[in-house]
Amino acid sequence: MSFTYNRTVRFQDTDAAGVVYFANVLGICHEAYEESLEASSINLKDFFTNPSVAFPIVHASVDFLRPMFVGDKLLISLIPQKIGVEKFEITYEVTVAEVVVAKAITRHVCIDASSRSKQELPDEIVQWLETNRRDAEGAERRRSREIM
């Protein structure tokens, strides 16, 4: 099963039209990413303040399928996937009452924080990717059996 994160849309997330401001969807997705790391026993303080390695987002996109309003109960599902020795990508699906309202992608590259050059993903991230991949594949197999 993919990792899931529950979040309620707050007033501060919205714009003058009363819907979630477009850039805030990526912030909400990043919250889900952080929760998934923490759920895998990755220390967030160490992860984000490690002086030797960083994971900048080099690509991000969001498709908005329906508006999200204050008070909406969001369920964010994420599936991270390794796409090279130094890169990974996370796909997000945001739903409200089982209706998909947005889909997003973030691509991350592992770099040496001093030289800013690419480097291989550390073992803890490879393990996080592998665990989430297995969980997502297992959920997909269960779903396909239910359809048959």
UniProtKB/Swiss-Prot annotation:
GO terms for molecular function: 1,4-dihydroxy-2-naphthoyl-CoA thioesterase activity; fatty acyl-CoA hydrolase activity. Pathway: Cofactor biosynthesis; phylloquinone biosynthesis; Quinol/quinone metabolism; 1,4-dihydroxy-2-naphthoate biosynthesis; 1,4-dihydroxy-2-naphthoate from chorismate: step 7/7. Keywords: Hydrolase. GO terms for biological process: phylloquinone biosynthetic process. SUPFAM superfamilies: Thioesterase/thiol ester dehydrase-isomerase (SSF54637). InterPro entries: 4-hydroxybenzoyl-CoA_TE, DHNA_CoA_hydrolase, HotDog_dom_sf. It comes from the Bacteria. CDD domains: 4HBT. Its EC number is 3.1.2.28. It catalyses: 1,4-dihydroxy-2-naphthoyl-CoA + H2O = 1,4-dihydroxy-2-naphthoate + CoA + H(+). The active site is at D15. PANTHER family: 4-HYDROXYBENZOYL-COA THIOESTERASE FAMILY MEMBER, ACYL-COA THIOESTER HYDROLASE YBGC. Catalyzes the hydrolysis of 1,4-dihydroxy-2-naphthoyl-CoA (DHNA-CoA) to 1,4-dihydroxy-2-naphthoate (DHNA), a reaction involved in phylloquinone (vitamin K1) biosynthesis. HAMAP family: DHNA_CoA_hydrolase (MF_02101). Belongs to the 4-hydroxybenzoyl-CoA thioesterase family. DHNA-CoA hydrolase subfamily. This is 1,4-dihydroxy-2-naphthoyl-CoA hydrolase.
